[in-house]
Amino acid sequence: MKDISQIFKSDIKIEDVKQENGIFCCMNDHFVSGDNQKYMKMYDWMSFFYDFGEKWIGKLKYGNGIDRLRTELMSRLEWKNAISVLYVSIGTGADLRYLPQGIDLKTIDLVGADISMGMLKRCKKQWQKKTNLTLVQCPAEELPFADNTFDIVFHNGGINFFNDKALAMSEMLRVAKPGSKLLIADETADFVETQYKKSVFSKSYFEGKTVDLNAIEQCIPASVAEKKTELFWNNKFYGITFRKSN
């Protein structure tokens, strides 16, 4: 990125922002509570084996299902070379392997945001030499970026259990450029019930939890255009695309 300071809000002085391992830390303790805090801790410890689990255990259990899912989700966005992209809840950056053919990641000004420092560190280790990547630790409910900054904003995995889903949606829209297309995706209630509540690694984190897709859809402001909800991977995942009004 040519000038990293340009992506941040005008009241944020880049030289004053704390960094850890080259990752900008913009955490507001107000949002590090409840489910946000619980799942931040979960992903911090899962970060050590997350990619291994998806590559090998996921492959054994689901075949190429996860690969097809990520490819389909990424195809719903309007990718071009030399654009600016915000990936909210970037995790280890797994979706970056599934961009449409012809897209050169090194031409893209890519910003990844996540509440989990563990996942961000894994992401940096895997992608810093392959991309033009800036990583920021922050809650989705308070993105530290300037209004109308990114050509693409997308989120895959997490919003089901954000503390304030509507605020996170509002923030993603705020930082997207007018006319740009956004994607929000996460697991359906069926997948949470049959996978996360059964897995020895995650069941304690999802006890008593459920997913209300209708409620999540209602968190998207009425001002958006071209809103569309799709189900993927045999109804295990949903994806909602919409366009920010000009």
PLM features per residue range, with description:
Residues 1-27:
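N-terminal accessory segments
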Residues 18-80, 94-98, 119-122, 126, ...:
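Conserved class I S-adenosyl-L-methionine
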Residues 84-142:
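Class I SAM-dependent methyltransferase SAM/SAH-binding core
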Residues 114-115, 164, 187:
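Short beta->alpha hinge that forms the Motif I/post-I loop of the SAM-binding pocket
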Residues 141-152:
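A short acidic, Gly/Pro-enriched loop at the edge of an enzyme's catalytic core
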Residues 151-164:
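A short SAM/SAH-binding and catalytic strip from SAM-dependent methyltransferases
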Residues 166-178:
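A short glycine-rich, Lys/Arg-flanked "PGG" loop and its adjoining helix->strand segment in the class I
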Residues 181-241:
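C-terminal alpha-helical "lid/dimerization" subdomain adjacent to the S-adenosyl-L-methionine
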